A protein has these predicted regions:
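Append "and occasionally in soluble cytosolic enzymes with long acidic Gly/Pro-rich linkers
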Residues: 1-80, 84, 145, 152, ...
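Bilobed periplasmic-binding protein-like "clamshell/Venus-flytrap" ligand-binding domains
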Residues: 6, 48-66, 107, 111-115, ...
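Short, solvent-exposed loop/beta-turn-alpha elements that line the ligand-binding surface or hinge
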Residues: 25-40, 50, 102-106, 127-158, ...
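Periplasmic binding protein-like
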Residues: 58, 80-134, 168
């Protein structure tokens, strides 16, 4: 992950261990990230009867996004790491609209995606990206539908008790870590250059641009 952050994000990102970024409420810092251990990976493949490795598709986005500035480069780095343990990845891409359509239809084996939050609420990540409902033509590209996870995120979105929501989302992050429906690689740091004569512009945490209080001097 550190190598990817350096090469793909030019250092403008942090290694991820949870779906939501560490700046969002409900973040569970007690979750331990997976260690980089190729020998253990080989042992697990052998245990699964795949000692000689296997081939798999790795879909890479054809566009540059705030959460992934160079998906092709990231895919190549993942491909190289997988090759070290005997997994041969074929990088696949399509035009962006076709990519999204095919991914929603579940045509991929593994697919690279990302997310920019819409409202600052953990539900916008957990339910939007990994709920059972979202696995059916939604944004749950992993197609993962897991009842113990669902039993945490659905009550969390239904209550207005903030402390209860925090507790439920922290538990949900543990479940995601243990089940691993996706490997969360990085949380990007987004920069917005502003000329010195522009006054009153504030960077929006949700990626929007507000100009009502902006002036030029």
């Amino acid at each position: 992950k550190d190598a990817i952050i350096k090469a793909v994000y030019q250092g403008a990102g942090v290694s991820a261990k949870n779906l939501i970024p560490p700046t969002m409420w409900g973040y569970n810092d007690d979750v331990q990230d997976y260690t980089y251990d190729p020998e253990k990976a080989k042992a697990l493949l052998k245990e699964a009867g795949l000692e000689k490795g296997f081939s798999i598709d790795l879909w890479a986005m054809p566009v540059q996004r705030p959460y992934n500035p160079n998906a092709r480069r990231m895919a190549e780095m993942i491909q190289a790491d997988w090759a070290k343990v005997g997994v041969q990845a074929k990088i696949v891409t399509y035009e962006w609209g076709e990519y999204l359509k095919r991914a929603k239809d579940g045509e991929h084996q593994t697919v690279m995606m990302g997310w920019t939050g819409d409202n600052g609420d953990p539900d916008n990540f957990f339910a939007t990206l990994f709920s059972c409902a979202a696995s059916e033509q939604g944004s749950n590209y992993s197609k993962w539908c897991y009842k113990p996870f669902e039993d945490l995120i659905q009550p969390a979105r239904a209550t207005d008790d903030h402390n209860k929501r925090v507790d439920l989302y922290k538990q949900a992050q543990v479940v995601m870590h243990d089940q691993a429906p996706a490997l969360i690689i990085a949380h990007s740091t987004v920069f917005e250059p502003v000329r010195k004569e522009v006054k009153g512009y504030v960077v929006d945490p949700l990626g929007k641009h507000h100009f009502e209080n902006v002036s030029i001097e």
